[in-house]
């Protein structure tokens, strides 16, 4: 809800700001080129500065301080989205005016741009959700979107009346080469450090046992530093938030979640465990001799696959 709110605020602000552009003598194509470049470069810059843009992970369900919760969500969403959405809000009216060519055709121009925008929003959501994110991951998907903005900037420049036609062609080729080289030289792990942290701060990468960027979340498992008292302690971190753990305290209640209900049933043959987590509840249910089948459901396939790291604590639940 907050991200949608910030998105709409950005679009609205951009629509107000573009009025000043219309009242000036600025070249609309030039302004649109700059806006497309700004969107692309901001997205690329955010990949390098995600830890600075977003606050450290925290408990977002603290309802005792609703104003603080609201302001923190708003600040994070604004840092990530506000400037690009302002640029998008300015681009839409500029495109309408460029396509219309005059007040007498404003209806046609608005319909064409609005139709293309709606179609693009639907197609973009489908392609991103079902193709880009599963196949490319978050970083490469964002980089691809930023590249599309930069390519649109190139197209607008190439089809404009800047300089001579030959010079425009040469500059377009150079820009395309620069974009290609930059894309090829991008590190593939820019967002890894962002997800390798929780509310206690940055985690030690030397203690990383498992890492996977999945469709719905990014999962990391770290070895906890509890010393000789608990040498096998581990922590499950999803999207930068510590969600579960294997240690003396956590393991006791997680296994009790299975043992107590099963002991209260006369003939417990089938068990359903909602949320897999570290798999300790699922594994504990499976050790009961009367239980014939245990089903565990979880929204995250990455969390389930990480369960192998906890096999010594969850009774090897995934291979039982």
Where in the sequence are the language-model features?
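Alpha-helical transmembrane segments of multi-pass membrane proteins
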Residues: 1-320
């Amino acid at each position: 809800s907050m991200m949608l709110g910030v998105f709409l605020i950005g679009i609205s602000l951009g629509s107000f700001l573009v009025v000043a552009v219309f009242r000036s003598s600025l070249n609309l194509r030039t302004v649109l080129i700059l806006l497309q470049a700004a969107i692309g470069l901001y997205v690329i810059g955010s990949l390098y500065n995600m830890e600075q843009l977003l606050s450290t992970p925290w408990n977002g369900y603290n309802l005792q301080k609703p104003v603080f919760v609201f302001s923190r969500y708003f600040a994070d969403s604004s840092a990530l989205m506000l400037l690009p959405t302002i640029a998008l809000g300015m681009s839409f009216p500029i495109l309408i005016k460029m396509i219309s060519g005059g007040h007498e055709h404003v209806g046609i121009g608005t319909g064409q741009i609005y139709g293309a925008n709606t179609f693009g929003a639907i197609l973009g959501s489908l392609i991103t959700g079902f193709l880009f994110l599963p196949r490319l991951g978050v970083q490469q998907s964002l980089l691809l979107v930023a590249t599309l903005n930069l390519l649109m900037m190139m197209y607008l420049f190439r089809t404009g009346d800047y300089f001579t036609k030959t010079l425009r062609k040469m500059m377009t080729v150079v820009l395309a080469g620069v974009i290609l080289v930059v894309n090829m030289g991008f590190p593939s792990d820019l967002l890894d450090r962002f997800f390798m942290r929780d509310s206690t701060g940055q985690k030690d990468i030397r203690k990383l046992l498992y890492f996977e960027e999945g469709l719905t979340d990014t999962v990391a498992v770290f070895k906890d530093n509890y010393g000789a008292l608990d040498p096998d302690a581990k922590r499950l971190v999803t999207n930068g938030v510590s969600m579960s753990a294997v240690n003396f305290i956590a393991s006791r209640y997680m296994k009790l979640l299975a043992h107590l209900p099963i002991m209260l049933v006369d003939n417990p043959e089938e068990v359903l465990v909602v949320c897999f987590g570290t798999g300790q509840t699922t594994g504990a249910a499976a050790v009961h001799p009367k239980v014939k089948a245990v089903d565990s459901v979880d929204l995250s396939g990455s969390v389930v696959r990480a369960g192998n790291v906890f096999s010594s604590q969850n009774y090897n639940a995934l291979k039982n």
